[in-house]
C-alpha cells in the first residue's frame, strides 16, 4: 500500500508529489499529473477527512484500507466518487455527501 510523502495543494489542485510503496521504494510523480483528483491509495493512516480545497473527483480505491478513518466530509465540488473509494474503511461512522455526487 502506498503512503503519501508530500503533496501540493496550491492553485486549487491536489498534486501528489512523492509516495512510498510497501517495498519502501520512494516514487515521484509529475506535479501536474493529477488535476483536482484524489487517486488510488493516496492516504493510508488518517482519521478524519475534510477537503478544504476544491476537488472534482475521488478516484477508484482512493481511501481503500484507511482503517483509522472515522469521518469524511465531501465538498460540493465533487461530482464523481470512484468504485471502492472507501472500501475496508472499517472505522468509518460519519460521511457527508453533497447533492452534486
What are these regions (language model features)?
Residues 1-7:
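Enriched but not universal
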Residues 7, 11-12, 18, 44-56, ...:
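Structural signature of tandem-repeat unit edges
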Residues 22-64:
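LRR flanking "cap" motifs
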Residues 59-62, 82-87:
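Consensus positions within tandem repeat domains that build extended binding/scaffold surfaces
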